[in-house]
Amino acid sequence: MKVIKVGTRKSKLAMTQTQQLVDQLKALHPERDFVLVPYTTKGDRLTHVSLQEIGGKGVFVKEIERALLAGEINMAVHSLKDMPAKLAEGCALGAISQREDVRDCLIFRQAGQTLADLPKGSLIGTSSIRRQVQLQAQRPDLAFKPLRGNIDTRIKKLEEGEYDAIVLAMAGLKRLGWLDQSRLHIQPLETSLCLPAISQGALAVECREEDEELLSLLAAVQDEKTAAEVAVERAVLAQMNADCTFPIAAFAQKNGQGYQLEAMLAKEDGQCIFVSLQGQDGQQLAEQAVRQLADKGAVGMPWLKK
């Protein structure tokens, strides 16, 4: 396998972060040639519709997985937060690279503002219910309006006055070099204020599970700490039978005592349920988190397993 075809979404962010990961592989395996193969997924095509309305799991990965299984490509690079807990049959996670900044951030139209001092009724752009409910818990007087599209489009809409502030992931801004541009007025949101999406900031390489040669090659870019932490978070996702469109969050940190896990679920009335646990066994910790969320009022939520 001299030439390795790498599937990715067509967006500027997806292409950039895929190229960054490929550059790591190329440095370790200079004898290999890597070719990026871009795809437009269902989630990319239907930008005028909310992800909740599109529905289903893997709206940003299904087309790429089909291409992988059909042999059109050898591997694919995804934002792990977009991937369902259960992969398509025949696919495997070949590597999870070192995690970027997990935090969300607010970007303001006017300089000098923070979440605390935004004027009452300010309009915030986000299509993420997870982000909205956590910000509303801090500022119930704010208004929210859906916002989808690539990062450049979202920032342009902010600067043109459609929103007073927008919410984006720090990881994407860093990978695209936006933080080097002084014109942005950014407030990073600490995880104590806004828990991130499950696996936010992590990239995953997917390949066919029988491709032992490629699996061996990909081991070089695996970050074991990141892989262990996101495995706990994705266990929460699996236990909830949910996907990236649902208002859930989880953030696991590996430490000397095992794992610290924070998880959040938004109820249908917008109330946020939080749990915080410490334990040695990540899988058991995820199961405990889901049980505690249920005990606190998540019973009967439509996406939880019966």
From Swiss-Prot:
Keyword Repressor: no
One MF term in the entry's GO annotations: hydroxymethylbilane synthase activity
Disulfide feature: none
Record GO biological process: protoporphyrinogen IX biosynthetic process
In-chain residues carrying the UniProt-annotated modification S-(dipyrrolylmethanemethyl)cysteine: 244
Enzymatic class: transferase
UniProt-listed Enzyme Commission number(s): 2.5.1.61
Summary of subunit composition and partner proteins: Monomer.
Stated family: Belongs to the HMBS family.
Leftover remarks: The porphobilinogen subunits are added to the dipyrromethane group.
Name of the featured protein: Porphobilinogen deaminase
